[in-house]
């Protein structure tokens, strides 16, 4: 049986969730990821993933119609999984379903409209009138009214479950690969030029809703000379945050995007993983995938009480108020002053991840849904 996973844009981090589902199913089924690529390339961290990826050109309307036709013609699967409530994934999947009667599983891991709604009035108006963009607001807004046409729906947090219903499947991780016992923290620190340093890590692309500004403000308040902020997977936009720092600029180390399979190596260098999410429409309907990376690697995690984060951590992390850089700085200091407590929280977080959020969990749930769809045909 062949499973085709549609990704709305292969060139950005939306490929992360699509890749996760593909890896969960690859041991049981023939799996392929397909979709358009806005930049023409594959998102770097998953460029070498051991799953076939078929990429198509991204164009503006009306020229994108030819891409849609090509994708629909090329799909030769028994089951479609559409990642994200987007027209270039779910929309295309529905057209293929109506043409060929192929069952569609809709995977929703973000509230897509939340990313559009955080702007002001005129920003919303401008985005809503952007009809030439295949992934634009008008078509994304329309997709919410078509969720009932999916044969099955899975969601990544309770906000989305309350809004769209469906089965709740959190981001999961392969805890056998993300295993701290397989990595040497000191040697990785030495490799990064951080020998004898205490490291606070931020994973992923810096964005305002991720609390990047609060993290830099917190670093300004920390006077301990051996503490460093290591940003892994950052792009060029991070430089403006560094330039705006009043002090401690020399304590910030930036690593560009890394391949997904190297993530455990870099994460092993962290003493603390910081995920200071803000409370915005961007974050209310999502749960950060890096939360599960940190849990799997038994890292002490500082984060905020947004979305399902407290439930996922189960008390095995450090929760602060969103937007509070003072509290973030104090919590960093507290963790370094209480290493044994932090170590135990990290270990318990890993145990929780192994029990509830291992890749086998998502494999079992997806396989169950696929069997139901194929036996009812």
Task: Label each residue range with its predicted role.
Residues 190, 334, 341-356, 362:
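A short, well-ordered alpha-helix in the C-terminal region of glycosyltransferases
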Residues 240-264:
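Nucleotide-activated donor-binding/catalytic signature segment of Leloir-type glycosyltransferases, i.e.
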Residues 13, 210, 259-266, 271-296, ...:
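Nucleotide-sugar-dependent
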Residues 4-6, 194-210, 216-220, 229-230:
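Conserved donor-binding/catalytic core segment of Leloir-type glycosyltransferases
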Residues 36-39, 203, 228-241, 256:
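Glycosyltransferase donor-sugar binding loop
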Residues 159, 172:
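Carbohydrate-associated surface elements
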Residues 315-325, 334-340:
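Conserved acidic donor-binding segment of nucleotide-sugar-dependent glycosyltransferases
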